[in-house]
Amino acid sequence: MEALEKKLKVCEPDAYKLIVIDGVYSMLGDLAKLPEICDLCDKYGASVMIDDAHGLGVFGENGSGTASHFGLTDKVDLIMGTVSKSCGSLGGFIAGDHDVLNFIKHTSRSLIFSASMTPAATAAASKALDIMIEEPERREHLWDTTRYAWKCFRENGFDINLTESPIIPLMVRDTIKALSLVEEAYRKGVFITPVIAPAVPEKDVLIRFALMATHNRSHVDQAVEVLTKIFKEYGIIA
């Protein structure tokens, strides 16, 4: 927050200032400090835009995202997201003030030179949103499984950093080990993904363990058992 405030302080008071953040950070699974950021926006006359690719369907009322989770939807100027993750489709969206969206439609190069979503992708995304609203038990189940997974990994000595979401980083901090153990885990029935440089600094290489609403505690038990043995073999955990 200190670094952000320093930048805001040197901006011209009347200049337009837009703070662009992730709602949920895709590597470590932690959340943006949205309340503090919104306070700075009020203080310095800035606007805020959230890329909520990993918040939609998981956080907030009816899975409506990070801003809703913090009760700050009215404080956020633009919310951008994708329907390729929790919605299982293709495409994306941006929500905000009508005049701002009209401006984006006519000036955003990436939008101007892209094609519309196909009818099938649109229907799939629409149905997924209906399910999020009508079947909250799916999200409740996801969170039960997520909290259980946090507990299991920590009890077995894994470093899962500061995750606050179903994205669970398993810190490895070694590229060769990360790539090797991913292959070994796959052979033993556990699908995980490596995150290596340049996506993260070399010292922060990790394995991303991501949960879905269709996973349950028995899946977590199986995965933790397999990964604990492999991580011990590679000397990552004691």
What are these regions (language model features)?
Residues 1, 13, 17-21, 60, ...:
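Pyridoxal 5′-phosphate
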Residues 1-3, 23-28, 55-58, 111-112, ...:
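Short, small-residue-enriched loops and turns at beta-alpha junctions
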Residues 1-50:
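Active-site phosphate-binding strand-loop segment of PLP-dependent enzymes
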Residues 43-44, 156, 188, 234:
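Helix C-cap/helix->beta junction micro-motif
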Residues 44-47, 54, 59-164:
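Active-site C-terminal subdomain of aminotransferase-like
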Residues 140-149, 154-189, 199-204, 211-213:
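Conserved PLP-binding catalytic core of the aspartate aminotransferase-like
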Residues 187-190, 199-238:
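PLP-dependent enzyme catalytic core of the Aspartate aminotransferase-like
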